[in-house]
Amino acid sequence: MEYQTLWQRYLDWLYYHQNLGFYVDISRIRFDDAFIDSIKPKFEKAFKDMEELEKGAIANPDEGRMVGHYWLRAPELAPNDEVRKEITEPLKQIEEFVAKVLKGTIKPPTADKFTDIISVGIGGSALGPQFVSEALAGDFPPMGIHFIDNTDPAGIDRVVTRLKDRLKSTLVIVTSKSGGTPETRNGMLEMRHAYEKNGLDFPKYAVAVTMPGSKMDQVAHDWLARFPMQDWVGGRTSELSAVGLLPAALQGIDIQGMLAGAKEMDEATRVKDLKNNPSALLALSWYYAGNGKGEKDMVVLPYKDSLALLSRYLQQLVMESLGKEKDLDGNTVYQGIAVYGNKGSTDQHAYVQQLREGVPNFFVTFIEVLEDRQGSSIELEPGVTSGDYLAGFIQGTRQALYENHRDSITITIPEVNPRTVGALVALYERAVSFYGSLVNVNAYHQPGVEAGKKAAASILELQQNVMKALKEAGTELDLETLSQKAGHPDKVEAVYKIVRHLAANNRGVMLKGDLGKPTTLKVSFG
């Protein structure tokens, strides 16, 4: 495409939000006018779907739930007074609690103030807060934050060990919608043990974010505080609920600024005009790039260190929402878009080589931040700063990819602050909603995650049966015999992996034989 034609295409498809200073450029996605004409009816339906969703329609039919994360920054749009109170009252509770903690009115029993936070949660309860903390927390926040987002014992130990004697001034936030998520439950129990081991009364250091009446809500009845999660907010869209706002506010982040930015972006993404709706432009680009079937991966490249966790946050938001086997009509469709990325220009020295010359199975989203830093920059050579290099690398990489027929989107923001981060969250939340409508999938449930939980529970049940069989046998058993005695002769491989793990962790299980040849192993207990 000639320079003048490409420049005109850029002008034709550039979106700019004046108040937010946001640019969305999809000119390097190679759709044509015929494609736009063909997809307009789908967007008419998508706009209607979003309108009905925001009015309180059951947008998650598999679970019979409303989908209301857009109301979190515009309570006046909630369908009734009860829902409005579910938004405004927790926000007030958060602000009052945070003020008391930061002033030292609410404090730990053996210290003047809380100095740190341990956030226990997984999935959306971790990825959103981690992204926001990395993007917005100051160099010296009023409270430092540490995350336990897995059931990895060594990872948990690392967090506790690094805190040293600051554990006595550390507030624990346990976030679980149902209270039944195993990883979060395990993290909570590990924290309780760590506090008690150090002579600390855990309930006086803990708060919960959960649904009223949940298992976690009952466990936390004597904790410092409980903050409600709404039934109509999913984990991956919960950053602007108590899930994300509480830890952000405790770090001194302006949560009202985040909500304001999200609200402004929501208003922009309600516009029923494809060219003037930034989230619709993203969904359009995703659909074209992947042929409406997720045939190409989404590579997210923010050229700003503080946005390095954006790709991990979007990975869940996009993949858990859109990665579905069935569509809303019950047809098998295998939908989804794979998301990965880190940051520029670091990635130019990692996998961009493949992006430029390897398998063309992707499209890139560049995130550009206009402000280099607060304050002036030195000149590394006449008239050139380190920020100029970064800006040059964005343009250069974009051009190099396009020349080799690799498409890209560029999102440009003025700076990284609470307002722009809130707007980014809202931009992508709506884009996912639109794309879900375009491909006719339920973007608000996660049956595959639930299937994984059930499978893991069955392995733990098998482990109990294996231990019982070993203790009752009182002698060495080969793997096949052990599997039979455990009641599962068809699960020899699973039994082998269970006993191998138990033996490695001094759980009383002993293995004799050639470890490289499982059929030679004899297993015993004692």
Swiss-Prot record:
GO terms for molecular function: carbohydrate derivative binding; glucose-6-phosphate isomerase activity; monosaccharide binding. It holds the Pfam family PGI. CDD domains: SIS_PGI_1, SIS_PGI_2. Its EC number is 5.3.1.9. InterPro entries: G6P_Isomerase (IPR001672), Phosphoglucose_isomerase_CS (IPR018189), SIS_dom_sf (IPR046348), SIS_PGI_1 (IPR035476), SIS_PGI_2 (IPR035482). This is Glucose-6-phosphate isomerase. The lineage of its organism: Bacteria, Bacillati, Cyanobacteriota, Cyanophyceae, Oscillatoriophycideae. It is found in: Cytoplasm. It catalyses: alpha-D-glucose 6-phosphate = beta-D-fructose 6-phosphate. Keywords: Cytoplasm, Gluconeogenesis, Glycolysis, Isomerase. One of its GO terms (biological process) is glycolytic process. It is an enzyme of class 5 (isomerase). Catalyzes the reversible isomerization of glucose-6-phosphate to fructose-6-phosphate. Its main location: cytoplasm. NCBIfam families: PRK14096.1. Belongs to the GPI family. The active site is at E320 (proton donor), H349, K453. Pathway: Carbohydrate biosynthesis; gluconeogenesis; Carbohydrate degradation; glycolysis; D-glyceraldehyde 3-phosphate and glycerone phosphate from D-glucose: step 2/4. SUPFAM superfamilies: SIS domain. One of its GO terms (cellular component) is cytosol. It comes from Gloeothece citriformis (strain PCC 7424).
